[in-house]
Design a protein with these regions (language model features):
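Short glycine-rich, Thr/Ser-proximal phosphate-binding strand/loop in the N-terminal lobe
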Residues: 4-42, 297
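Short glycine-aspartate micro-motif
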Residues: 5-9, 62-64, 145-149, 272-273
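ATP-binding/phosphotransfer module of carbohydrate and carboxylate kinases, centering on a glycine-rich
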Residues: 15, 20, 184-187, 191-317
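Short acidic-glycine loop/turn motifs at beta-strand connectors
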Residues: 21-25, 102, 158-163
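N-terminal phosphate-binding loop and adjacent alpha-helix
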Residues: 26-61, 70-77, 188
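Short beta-strand-loop/turn "lid" adjacent to the catalytic site in phosphate-handling enzymes
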Residues: 56-121
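Glycine-rich beta-strand-to-loop/alpha-helix junction loops that act as flexible
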Residues: 66-69, 150-153, 273-277
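Glycine-rich phosphate-binding loop plus the immediately following alpha-helix
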Residues: 113-217
Length: 317
């Protein structure tokens, strides 16, 4: 089949590109570490190199990019869409790349900004594309509900009639990585390997009693900074083995996220997670502890559905 367009999830540290044909079928995928930070000042050259070295791709293919590529650290700043915009309208707001060569159709997906009545402001870039993909992959039932998009910055989103009505971001993955690499907990937490996009822990942590203990402790509602120091106190007094600290801290952080954000979902509906299997499993463990229904949606399939739907609609330059 002949390639019709390229979709790129261009994050802070990583980039994943999909080559797709006119029927929406995936022809090939590529992933690398040419994220927004690594590409500073050379985004155009990086994209042209990606296309030039990709069999089946041609320079004139339309390219749709989402994520931090449209942020202040990205290629060009694309203004956020505001909360009242319907997700289904996302393709109508694609922004052309200002310095694209003549004849090239390169576009960046805008991020999302939500301002609450009490003055709280939250934003996202990239996750709006996945939510758009969920609407197209799942159909009308996806227009209402609670979604979790875990990662370095975990997003909890409430949709109503296809519009984002609530958005809460948690620095769960970033905090775990910082605690594991720096400070007084680092030596204990580094005794167990991390994995996953957010580095939260290996798959077996789901069945680890220390992880579940951390989730349960967070459910009690302690001040998180105090609970985190409690991990150090347990290790230095011998109440906790050093190798258990990473699982316990992982449970505290994800558990604190759940303790606050689960209110976005009603008791009679599932919490839907869009993410890789390792992180989804951690969130599923939290859902079980809180007595919540839970559904896992494959992030890769969601992303491909988004690219297909965007390419199928008219692109307004």
């Amino acid at each position: 089949m002949t390639a019709a367009f390229i979709g790129i999830d261009w994050g802070t540290t990583h980039r994943r590109a999909a080559l797709i044909d006119a029927d929406g079928a995936l022809l090939d995928e590529r992933a690398d570490d040419d994220g927004a930070l690594a590409c500073k000042g050379r985004f155009r050259d990086s994209l042209e190199a990606l296309v030039a070295g990709w069999p089946g791709a041609t320079p004139v293919l339309p390219v749709i990019m989402a994520g931090m590529v449209g942020s202040a650290i990205g290629w060009q700043v694309v203004p956020y869409l505001e909360g009242g915009t319907a997700l289904s309208d996302l393709p109508r707001h694609l922004q052309p790349v200002a310095d694209a060569p003549a004849g090239r159709r390169w576009f960046i997906v805008p991020g999302w900004c939500l301002r609450s009545e009490d003055g709280d402001i939250d934003v996202m870039r990239g996750e709006e594309t996945q939510l758009f993909g969920a609407l197209h992959l799942l159909g009308p039932d996806a227009s209402d509900g609670c979604y979790v998009l875990p990662g370095t910055h975990s997003k909890w989103v409430r949709l109503h009639a296809g519009r984002i009505t609530e958005l809460r971001t948690y620095m769960t993955g970033e905090l775990f990585a910082l605690l594991r690499q720096h400070g007084t907990l680092a030596s204990a937490m580094q005794s167990t390997p991390a994995s996953g996009a957010a580095g939260l822990h290996h798959d077996s942590v789901v069945d680890d009693p220390d992880f579940l203990r951390g989730v349960a402790e967070a459910a009690r509602g302690p001040v998180l900074t105090h609970a985190l120091f409690g991990a150090r106190a347990r290790v230095v007094t011998g109440a906790m083995a050093p190798g258990a600290a990473a699982a316990y801290v992982s449970g505290l952080l994800i558990g604190a996220e759940w303790a606050d954000a689960q209110r976005l979902a009603s008791r009679d509906e599932p919490v839907r997670v869009i993410g890789e299997s390792a992180l989804a499993a951690l969130h599923a463990a939290c859902a079980r502890l809180h007595g919540r229904r839970f559904e896992t949606l494959d992030a890769r399939q969601i992303q491909l559905a988004a690219w297909r739907a965007m390419a199928a609609e008219e692109i307004h330059a």
